[in-house]
Amino acid sequence: MKIAVAGGGSWGSALAHLLAANACDVTLLVRDAVQARRINADHVNPDYLPDVVLHSSVRATVDDAEALDGAGLLLMAVPCQHFRKVLQRLRPLLPPEPVVVCANKGIEVENLCTVSEVVAQELEGTGHTFAMLSGPSFAVEVMRDMPTAVVLGCRDAATGRRLRHIFSYGLFRTYSSTDVRGVELGGAVKNVIAIAAGLADGLGFGHNARAALITRGLAEMSRLGVAMGARASTFMGLSGMGDLVLTCTGDLSRNRQVGLKLAQGMTLEEVTRSMRMVAEGVKTTEAVHTLAARLQVDLPITSAMYDVLHSGKNPRDAVRELMSRELKEE
C-alpha cells in the first residue's frame, strides 16, 4: 500500500519509519525543502530526530501532489491548531472515498472541534473513512524499536481490524476500538494534566502530588469524555490511562517540560520560544476549559492550569486552591 504521511515532525517521521518497515510505500510530506533533502540523502530528520536513522525507503517531499499521487491512505501528523488548513489544502488531491488516519492530539481553540469533527466537516461528501491513532508512544522509542502499544479508534470495527495490522510491526502493537471520541479525547486532555504534573514536580511537591494529579486527572478526562459521548471504559485503556501516565512521568514529554520550565520561573512566552516542537497542551488547556464551561463539567485541574497559563496565576497559589476545595466523595 502507498501511504502519504503529512507532517515531518518527530511523530510523523517515526510513523513513516514504522510503516516503511512494514513494507508500505511511504512518502513523507514536509514543509522545508532542506529537511526533505536531508531525509532523502542521509535518512535522518535533522530537526526532530537527529540521532536515529529513518528507514531507507521513506521518501520526503514538499510537493502535495507528489506525496498523494496513488496513495491509498493519508496519515495526518500535523499539530491540531494547523490541522484544518492543511486538510483543506490536501482535499482536492485526495482519491474518492479516502482513508484518513490521524495521529495528532488536541482540540481546536477557535472552533472547539476535536480532530474527528474537523475531518467530518472538511471531508464532507467524500465518503471518507476516518481513524484515530493514539496512546503512550514517544517517537524516539518507536524509532529504536522499543516495545510500544497504542490504540486505533475507528467506528467501523472491521475497518479498524484491517488498519491495526497496517500499523503493527515488530514491537509496535496496535489495538482497535470503536470509541473514536474516547480515543481522541484521551490523547488531547492528558496533555493538560501533564503540564500540571510537570509543574508540581518542578516545584518539588513530591511523588504523592504527582500520583494525585494523575488519578484525579484521569477522572477529569473521563467526566469530559462521557459528557461528549465517549465510553468511560476507554479512558482506562491506552489512549487514556496509558498516555496519561507516560506524558505525566516521562521527561521526553513536551507538555511535562512546559510545566517544569514554568516552575523554574519562565514565562509562558519564554517557554514557547525555547521549544522547537509544539506542546499541544497549552492550546488544548484553553479549549478544554471553554468546553467544560459550555458542558457544565467540573474540571478543577484544567481550570487551575488555565489560570496559570492564560491568566498569570502563581502556580503555588493554584495548587493551594486545588487542595483547599470543598471535600467530597471520590
Swiss-Prot record:
GO MF: glycerol-3-phosphate dehydrogenase [NAD(P)+] activity; NAD binding
Binding site for NADPH: S10, W11, R31, K105, A139, R254, V278, E280
Annotated TM spans: none
Reaction equation(s) it catalyzes: sn-glycerol 3-phosphate + NAD(+) = dihydroxyacetone phosphate + NADH + H(+); sn-glycerol 3-phosphate + NADP(+) = dihydroxyacetone phosphate + NADPH + H(+)
Active site: K190 (proton acceptor)
Family matches, as SUPFAM superfamilies: 6-phosphogluconate dehydrogenase C-terminal domain-like, NAD(P)-binding Rossmann-fold domains
Biological role: Catalyzes the reduction of the glycolytic intermediate dihydroxyacetone phosphate (DHAP) to sn-glycerol 3-phosphate (G3P), the key precursor for phospholipid synthesis.
NCBIfam families referenced in this protein's UniProt entry, alphabetically: PRK00094.1-2, PRK00094.1-4
HAMAP family: NAD_Glyc3P_dehydrog
Protein's UniProt name: Glycerol-3-phosphate dehydrogenase [NAD(P)+]
The species this protein was found in: Oleidesulfovibrio alaskensis (strain ATCC BAA-1058 / DSM 17464 / G20)
